[in-house]
C-alpha cells in the first residue's frame, strides 16, 4: 500500500469538457492509453470505453458521471501526476459539470472540428468562466469530412469571446490528416502510418508547403502573447525573437492569469483526431506545460464555522490544517459508498477522525483510494492538492467540508439548480416499495439535482430532474442497480407560482383555547413580488418593542416558507416573494413556536390570494440545426408550440434557428422534428428561465391540478 506525498509542482487536476459528440470520452481514452493506464483502447462505438463505467453510459455512448482517474505523463525527465475528472457533455447533466469544475485547477475543452462551437460548448465554457478555470482547447475530428480548423478557431473567438492562441496548424485535411506543425518549436509532428495506435510520431522539418503559413501564424502567436505578457512584449519591442523556453513560460503565465481575471480568457488551441490517434501526446505535453498546479491556484476561501462573515483562507500546503471538499458520492458495487474528495490543505489519513464542519459531526476516514475509471489503488494518506475517493464517510454529502476539528472551516458549497421536469413513479409491489426507498436515498446522495417528494393528495412518489434523459437514466438505474420494478408516469412540467401585486397588510390571529394549555399567536404581514434577480424568497422582520418575542420570529418565517411549498392556484411551489412581518401579539402562557408557525402560514396564504397570483412555466432555449429546405416547417412548428424565435443564422451550409419554447410544449419534439425534416435536423435545448403562463393555458393547468 502506497503512502503518497506528491510534489505539487508536478500535479495537474484537470477536467475534459465538451459538447455531447465532440469526442471527449475518446480523447480521455487515448490519454489513458498513452499514459499507460489502459492497455486496450476503449472505443465509445463498441461500448468499451474505460471512463464510461456505468452500463447505461456504455449503451448510450455518452458520459453521465464524472469518474476521477489518476495517470502519469513524463515530460523532459520529470514524471507528472494528472488527475482527470471526466465530465458529461449532455445538457441534462450540467450539475455534474458544475461540481467537477468546482474542484479542478484547469481544463481541456474539446471541440468538434466539423461542428465547431456548439450550444453545450457555450454552456460549459460559461460555467468554467464562472469558476475561473484556465483552459486549453483541442480541436478534434480533423480527419472528418467538412472539418475546418480555422473556422473552429474563429468560433472560439466570436462565440465564446475568448482569445485563442493558435499553437499548431494541421498538416493535411480530412482523410489525409497526417500531423501538426508545432508553432513554438517550429517543427512538424507527423504520425507514421505503421503505428496503428499512434504511439510513435516523428519530429521533422516543416514541409515546404506549410512554411509560409507556419511563419505567419508563428508571428501571430508571438504578437498575441506579447499583448498579454510584459516579458515577451519587451523582447518584441526590441525586435528579438523569444526562445522556446521563454515562449513556453509566457504562454503558461498568460493562460493561468486569464483564469483569475474577469477579462477575456486567453486559451492555447491544439488540434488532432483522437479517434485516429493523432495529436494526443502533444496535448498531454500542453496539459503539463500550460495548465496550473495546485500551487498556482490562490488560497481557497471559506468562512468561520461560528461566523459566516469571517473569511478563512487555506493555502495548498500540508503544513496548514486540513480542509477538503466532498464533491461527488458514488455507489461502488463492491465497496459501497465512495466519497470523492479534493484536499485543499493539510493531510487526510486513513483511520483518523475528521470534522464535517457543515454538520458539526465527526467522521472516520476509512480506506483511501486513488481511482482509475473502474479500478483502484489503496493509499494510506493524501496531501493538499490531490483528488481521491474515501470510504467510511456516513454523513457527508456533496458540497460539504471536511476539516480539522481544532481549526474548522466551511468551504463555499455548490449551488444546484431546481428540477424543471418530474415524473410520478409507482412501485409494482410492497417489496418494490422498500427497494424504491433505498434507491431514492442512494441516488439523491449521488446526484443533488435529483429531487423527490410525495404528492400529499395522491400519495404518489414524484421524482424531479434536469431533463427527460436525466430522469430516464435515473429510472433505468433504479431497475438495474436496485432491482426496483415500477410504473413510470408521463413526464410532468415543474410549474411554479408567484405573485404580481403588493399586499400592504394582512392580520391573522391563531387562537385555540379549549381548556388546558391553549394556542395563541397574532401576526400582521405584508407581501410583495421580488423584482428581477434570482431570489425565490426573502423574509424581513420589522417588529419592534417586543410585540412578538424574538424566539418566535423564526417560526413565522418557517410558517410562510412552508405555505410557499404548495401554492394557492394549483399547489405548485411559490417563488419570488418577499414577506415582511410588521406587527403582532402574543400570550404569556398560550403562545408557542407552533402557534406562530401556523399563524405565519395562514397569514401568508390569505395574503397570497389577494396578491394576484400567477402561474410560471420553465422556458427552454432551443437551438435547431436544419437544412435550408425545412426552415419554414421548423419555424412554423416552433411558433405552434408557443415559441418565440430569437435568432437565425447560417452555419456550415445549414440554418440554425434559436428560440425560447415552453418545456410543456417540447415533449415528443424529437419525433416530430425527425418526421418534419426526414431526420436531417437536430436540436438541443437547455433551461433558460421561468415565464408567466398565458391565462387560457393557465386555466387549463389549474383545472387539471384540481381534478376538475
Curated annotation (Swiss-Prot):
Main subcellular location of this protein, as a coarse class: cytoplasm
GO terms for MF: GTP binding; GTPase activity; translation elongation factor activity
Record keywords: Cytoplasm, Elongation factor, GTP-binding, Nucleotide-binding, Protein biosynthesis
UniProt key word Glycosyltransferase: no
Recorded family membership: Belongs to the TRAFAC class translation factor GTPase superfamily. Classic translation factor GTPase family. EF-G/EF-2 subfamily.
GO BP annotations, alphabetical order: ribosome disassembly
Protein's cellular compartments: Cytoplasm
InterPro entries: EF-G-like_DII, EFG_II, EFG_III, EFG_III/V, EFG_IV, EFG_V, EFG_V-like, G_TR_CS
SMART domains: EFG_C, EFG_IV
Protein purpose: Catalyzes the GTP-dependent ribosomal translocation step during translation elongation. During this step, the ribosome changes from the pre-translocational (PRE) to the post-translocational (POST) state as the newly formed A-site-bound peptidyl-tRNA and P-site-bound deacylated tRNA move to the P and E sites, respectively. Catalyzes the coordinated movement of the two tRNA molecules, the mRNA and conformational changes in the ribosome.
Organism for this UniProt entry: Streptomyces coelicolor (strain ATCC BAA-471 / A3(2) / M145)
Domain tr-type G residue range list: 9-295
A GO CC term attached to the entry: cytoplasm
Chain residues that bind GTP: 18-25, 86-90, 140-143
UniProt KW GTP-binding keyword: yes
Signal peptide bounds: none
Name of the protein described by the UniProt record: Elongation factor G 1
Name of the coding gene: fusA
Domain of life: Bacteria
Amino acid at each position: 500500500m502506497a503512502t503518497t506525498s506528491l510534489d505539487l509542482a508536478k500535479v495537474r487536476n484537470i477536467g475534459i469538457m465538451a459538447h455531447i459528440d465532440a469526442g471527449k470520452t475518446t480523447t480521455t481514452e487515448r490519454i489513458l492509453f498513452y499514459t499507460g493506464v489502459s492497455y486496450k483502447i476503449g472505443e465509445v462505438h463498441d461500448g468499451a470505453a474505460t471512463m464510461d463505467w456505468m452500463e447505461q453510459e456504455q449503451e448510450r455512448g455518452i458520459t453521465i458521471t464524472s469518474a476521477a482517474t489518476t495517470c502519469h505523463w513524463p515530460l523532459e525527465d520529470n514524471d507528472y501526476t494528472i488527475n482527470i475528472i471526466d465530465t458529461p457533455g449532455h445538457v441534462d447533466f450540467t450539475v455534474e459539470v458544475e461540481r467537477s469544475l468546482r474542484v479542478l485547477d484547469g481544463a481541456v475543452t474539446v471541440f468538434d472540428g466539423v461542428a465547431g462551437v456548439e450550444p453545450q460548448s457555450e454552456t460549459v465554457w460559461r460555467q468554467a468562466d464562472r469558476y475561473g478555470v484556465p483552459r486549453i482547447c483541442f480541436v478534434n475530428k480533423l480527419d472528418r469530412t467538412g472539418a475546418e480548423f480555422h473556422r473552429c478557431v474563429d468560433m472560439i473567438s466570436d462565440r465564446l469571446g475568448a482569445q485563442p492562441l493558435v499553437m499548431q496548424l494541421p498538416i493535411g485535411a480530412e482523410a489525409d490528416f497526417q500531423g501538426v506543425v508545432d508553432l513554438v518549436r517550429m517543427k512538424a509532428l507527423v504520425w507514421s502510418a505503421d503505428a496503428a495506435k499512434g504511439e510513435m510520431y516523428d519530429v521533422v522539418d516543416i514541409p515546404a508547403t506549410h512554411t509560409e503559413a507556419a511563419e505567419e501564424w508563428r508571428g501571430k502567436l508571438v504578437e498575441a502573447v506579447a499583448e498579454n505578457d510584459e516579458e515577451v512584449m519587451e523582447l518584441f519591442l526590441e525586435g528579438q525573437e523569444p526562445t522556446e523556453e521563454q515562449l513556453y513560460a509566457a504562454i503558461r503565465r498568460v493562460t493561468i492569469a486569464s483564469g483569475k481575471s474577469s477579462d477575456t480568457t486567453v486559451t492555447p488551441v491544439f488540434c488532432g483526431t483522437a479517434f485516429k490517434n493523432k495529436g494526443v501526446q502533444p496535448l498531454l505535453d500542453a496539459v503539463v506545460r500550460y495548465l496550473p498546479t495546485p500551487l498556482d491556484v490562490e488560497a481557497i476561501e471559506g468562512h468561520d464555522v461560528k461566523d459566516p462573515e469571517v473569511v478563512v483562507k487555506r493555502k495548498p500546503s500540508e503544513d496548514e490544517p486540513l480542509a477538503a471538499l466532498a464533491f461527488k458520492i458514488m455507489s461502488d458495487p463492491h465497496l459501497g459508498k465512495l466519497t470523492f474528495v479534493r484536499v485543499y490543505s493539510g493531510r487526510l489519513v486513513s483511520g483518523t477522525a475528521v470534522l464535517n464542519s457543515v454538520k458539526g459531526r465527526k467522521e472516520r476516514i476509512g480506506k483511501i483510494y486513488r481511482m482509475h475509471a473502474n479500478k483502484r489503488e489503496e493509499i494510506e494518506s493524501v496531501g493538499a492538492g490531490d483528488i481521491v475517493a474515501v470510504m467510511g464517510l456516513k454523513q457527508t454529502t456533496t458540497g460539504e467540508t471536511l476539516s480539522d476539528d481544532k481549526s474548522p472551516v466551511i468551504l463555499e458549497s455548490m449551488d444546484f439548480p431546481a428540477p424543471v421536469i418530474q415524473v410520478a413513479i409507482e412501485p409494482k409491489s410492497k417489496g418494490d416499495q422498500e427497494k424504491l426507498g433505498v434507491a431514492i436515498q442512494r441516488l439523491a446522495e449521488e446526484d443533488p439535482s435529483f429531487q423527490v417528494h410525495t404528492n400529499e393528495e395522491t400519495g404518489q412518489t414524484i421524482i424531479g430532474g434536469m431533463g427527460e434523459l436525466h430522469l430516464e437514466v435515473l429510472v433505468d438505474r433504479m431497475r438495474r442497480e436496485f432491482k426496483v420494478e415500477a410504473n413510470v408516469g408521463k413526464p410532468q412540467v415543474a410549474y411554479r407560482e408567484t405573485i404580481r401585486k403588493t399586499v400592504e397588510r394582512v392580520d391573522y390571529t391563531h387562537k385555540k383555547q379549549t381548556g388546558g394549555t391553549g394556542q395563541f399567536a397574532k401576526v400582521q404581514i405584508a407581501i410583495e413580488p421580488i423584482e428581477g434577480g434570482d431570489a425565490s424568497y426573502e423574509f424581513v422582520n420589522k417588529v419592534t418593542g417586543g410585540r412578538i418575542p424574538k424566539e418566535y420570529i423564526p417560526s413565522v418565517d418557517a410558517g410562510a416558507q412552508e405555505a410557499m411549498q404548495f401554492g394557492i392556484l394549483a399547489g405548485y411551489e411559490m417563488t419570488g416573494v418577499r414577506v415582511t412581518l410588521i406587527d403582532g401579539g402574543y400570550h404569556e402562557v398560550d403562545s408557542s413556536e407552533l402557534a406562530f408557525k401556523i399563524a405565519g402560514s395562514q397569514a401568508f396564504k390569505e395574503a397570497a390570494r389577494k396578491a394576484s397570483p400567477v402561474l410560471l412555466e420553465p422556458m427552454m432555449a432551443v437551438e435547431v440545426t436544419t437544412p435550408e429546405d425545412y426552415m419554414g416547417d421548423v419555424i412554423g412548428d416552433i411558433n405552434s408550440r408557443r415559441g418565440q424565435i430569437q435568432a437565425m443564422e447560417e452555419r456550415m451550409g445549414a440554418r440554425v434557428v434559436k428560440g425560447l419554447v415552453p418545456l410543456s410544449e417540447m415533449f415528443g419534439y424529437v419525433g416530430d422534428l425527425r418526421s418534419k425534416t426526414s431526420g436531417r435536423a437536430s436540436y438541443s435545448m437547455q433551461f433558460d428561465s421561468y415565464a408567466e403562463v398565458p391565462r387560457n393555458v393557465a386555466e387549463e393547468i389549474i383545472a387539471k391540478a384540481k381534478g376538475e
